[in-house]
Amino acid sequence: MRTVAHDVSEQGPSAWQKFLADEPAFFLASEGLLVFPSGAAAKAGIPELVRKIKHIELTWGDDLRVDPLTAEFAVVGASYHEVRVDPKGDRLDEKGFFTGTAEYREGRWQFRNTHWSVIVPPAPTH
């Protein structure tokens, strides 16, 4: 998980390509929506993220959980903090919780599915 945060922060959104399984079984959901229904959809969508995000910083919280299911599969979860800056310089500061199923194949870990859950700020009181 440290490698994921490091590479995404250093290389930008394009780094996600090496961590997301490029296969039909892959999916990525965020806030209750299916963002990428397959590895091919993620691969096709990442270039758009590269255009929309000039800079990104991803850090995981100290609450990382890893539940090994087999020698090749594990479920992971952790809080996260992400700062994204768009090409105009507008900054988005986001916190939430990440979960995913990781698979070890071809000498490395990749996510077979992921879910991002964002902490929604409280509604203003009147």
Indicate residue ranges for each PLM-predicted region:
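Short, cysteine-centered beta-strand-loop-beta hairpins and adjacent loop/turn segments enriched
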Residues: 52, 82-92
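A mature extracytoplasmic/lumenal domain signature
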Residues: 20, 32, 78-80, 115
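A short hydrophobic beta-strand element
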Residues: 58, 72-82
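A short, structured loop/turn motif at beta-sheet edges
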Residues: 66-75, 90, 102-110
